[in-house]
Amino acid sequence: MWPQYIGHTANAPLLRRPPEPGLDLGVFFLQHDHSGGEGWTWARRLLRRRGVGPQVGDGALGQRLRDFVSRSVTFAMPNRKAAYELTHIIFYLSDYGRQIPELPDGTLKSLHFTGLLAFLDQDMDLLAEVCAALRFSGNYPSPLWEDAIAAYHRALRVQAEPDAPMQDDYHEFLVTGWAMKIADRSSLAQTMPQGALRFHASRSGQGALRPLAACLNDMGAQRRADWGYMRPHVLSYLGPDSHAILLAAERSGPHFEQFFEGFARARA
């Protein structure tokens, strides 16, 4: 959940429950979130802003969060729900960058694995969250990742459109601009039109994640978890754009070989 919503009260009719003046969203989520996951964490953060209850990282819930973020093997495979839970947990534990959280071993690797998946897929929304989470945890993202986010954000176009659809690229605009702000980079400078707006991102190609997965699938039982062995096979399989993205991912940080070992799901 985004910081602009924190402190809001619940809209009872929208939530389809009897009116209850001043119902805080944190209380609502504590009452209605049964996953035992991010909803509870977010609710605890909201309540702490009112001076109620324990800190986000305290007790059994805090331990559960730390156990989750430290299981880096979870984040070597595409799982958007788990990926966003990871970044949001770091946001909450760091109080959105107000403090450096004490994180267990494995957390940094979890963030890097998630960032590699996002970069390979050219998913700039998720990659921006990973970069923000890395900075909030006291680490620096790969400059290649932040350069990609900056280029994506600056290519976004905002235009007035009376019948603008609800589903557009606003969230990508928001989170990539936010990540650039955290990194002290200048964000999109353009005059916002009046009225209903449409946010449009310029996308090219499909990234390298799907071609990489297709290559491994085509190799079947012959694929290996050893990136050194697999590298020439994979690179010869990919097209020019995917090839370039994969090479950039490989040099973006120190964890690519370990990431590939988990992603390949093959014997060493």
Feature-to-residue mapping (PLM):
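Terminal, non-catalytic domain-edge segments
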Residues: 31, 142-268
